[in-house]
Amino acid sequence: GHDCVMDPWYSLGSADMLEVASMGLHVAQMTGVEQMQACFHAITEVPAAILGLEGYGLEKGCNADLVILQAADPVEALRLKANRLFVIRRGKIIAQSEPLQSNLDLPGRPKSENFLKQS
């Protein structure tokens, strides 16, 4: 396993499992959509199932522990190492970030871009 925590054994850690998954996808050359979705699943739902956590998931009666990402889907979350808009624990927002937006100054181009897929 890999927890990506900055400690004496791994000084480059950021505690960011999206970063770990992205690195793994690149190293293993897992660029197929199904492979990327499986990798996202491996850092989200699979660990809770392996640990036998109860009250985990998006169903009535669950703990409501979740992270809302600025991404349209799992592949985009991995591609962009998506911004965390909200971190929710037991139904309470414990961290919040503004959506990322890049301002541009290029003639004939939009004034801003968020690099998300357009629907």
Describe the function of each predicted region.
Residues F40-S119:
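Active-site microenvironment of metallo-dependent hydrolases
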Residues G1-L69:
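His/Asp/Glu-enriched, well-ordered alpha-helical/loop segment
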